[in-house]
Design a protein with these regions (language model features):
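Signal peptide processing junction and immediate N-terminal pro/mature segment
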Residues: 29-41
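N-terminal secretory signal peptides that target proteins for export/translocation
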Residues: 1-13
Length: 194
């Protein structure tokens, strides 16, 4: 799953009771990070020293998405929306390989990206050229029982203020409220954003 890490245990099967007792004793000496415990792997850091993958947003209204990490590579696509969230999936020197909400990947110069967190609401529900879009409810608190502030169409861009892993507080077109985190593309499942 994107953005989450598998936690598991390495199962140890000591050959004798003595070996089992030594293992327990060794665990007591070295603490919970002993031989059998295997925690979640640390996120990989890219050339920038920042975690990969991670969400960022576009700084400019015109950002070239290139087929490779350099200006000598052809432009495959031009993003035309500042603030659009993209996921950094790889880094090479000053270039970042990114993926957008539709799954398109390519390379962008790192200076064209911002750490500002944004999200697209229900991008998988956008129906191009068809009438009414799917709606998400923006609420006045982080609960399904909270009153509605606004209804927001699929594909709308939101600014993320905070996320607690279940709900995100966002601003959309002059409205502020809470939306369920799984309805956003731009924040990982269970990710906390402060």
């Amino acid at each position: 799953m994107r953005g989450s890490f598998h936690k598991g245990l390495v199962h140890c099967q000591p050959r004798t009771v003595t070996a089992a007792l030594l293992l327990v004793f060794a665990q007591a000496l070295v603490g919970p990070t002993g031989l059998c415990a295997q925690g979640a792997p640390a996120p990989a850091n890219g050339a920038s020293g920042l975690p990969v993958p991670r969400f960022v947003s576009l700084k400019s209204d015109r950002v070239n998405l290139r087929q490779g990490p350099g200006t000598e590579y052809p432009t495959a696509w031009v993003f035309r929306r500042a603030g659009l969230p993209v996921e950094v999936i790889k880094e090479f020197e000053s270039w970042r390989q990114v993926r957008d909400a539709e799954g398109t990947t390519g390379w962008v110069l790192g200076s064209m990206l911002s750490g500002r967190r944004t999200a697209v609401i229900l991008p998988w529900e956008v129906k191009a050229g068809q009438g009414q879009q799917a709606l998400a409810v923006l609420r006045d608190d982080d609960s399904e029982r909270a009153g509605p502030v606004a209804q927001v169409e699929a594909g709308v861009l939101a600014n993320i203020i905070t996320c607690d892993g279940k709900w995100c507080r966002v601003s959309v077109g002059g409205f502020r409220g809470y939306i369920e985190q799984p309805k956003l593309w731009g924040a990982y499942k269970d990710e906390v954003i402060k």
